[in-house]
Regions:
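Claisen-condensing/thiolase-fold acyl-transfer catalytic domains that form or cleave C-C bonds
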Residues: 1-144
């Protein structure tokens, strides 16, 4: 379901965090923006995740948790199948169908959810990915 939402994420360099004595809750390892043909938009996250992990030289089975946005319930299921990701690693607290799909801040919602899930489950690395219209997808790899 669509839901109202507002969010803010603060990004800063390690140097600035040290200067301000701020303890970051996560570190960005890498990111990717990719696209596929618009009729294949539901599979776009898998393309983006593959490119992201290749660039960061990370094996998919070394990622602890994934958040894959689900404007449609089948999106994470399809991408789990394409990437051979275990179900217990994806959207472990539910996805947008159960938590809401906040118009305009879905990326911030899934990234924040991923960070908290990693902390709550004593995990250290994760990937968040989202379809962003017209066949595009964005993914980010983080560590805590």
């Amino acid at each position: 379901p669509m839901s109202d939402g507002a969010s803010m994420l603060i990004l800063m360099s390690r140097k600035k965090a040290i200067e301000l004595n701020i303890n970051p809750i996560a570190k960005i390892i890498n990111y990717d923006d990719s696209s596929v043909s618009s009729e294949l938009f539901t599979s776009a996250p898998s393309t983006s995740i593959k490119k992201l992990l290749k660039r960061s030289k990370t094996k998919i089975n070394s990622i602890d948790l994934f958040e894959i946005n689900e404007a449609f319930a089948m999106v994470p299921l399809l991408n789990m199948d394409i990437l051979s990701i275990e179900r217990n690693k994806v959207n472990i607290n539910g996805g947008a169908v159960s938590l809401g799909h906040p118009l305009g801040c879905s990326g911030a919602r899934i990234l924040t959810t991923l960070i908290h899930c990693l902390h709550q489950n004593n995990k250290t690395n994760g990937v968040a990915s989202i379809c962003n219209g017209g066949g595009g997808a964005s993914s980010i790899q983080i560590a805590i």
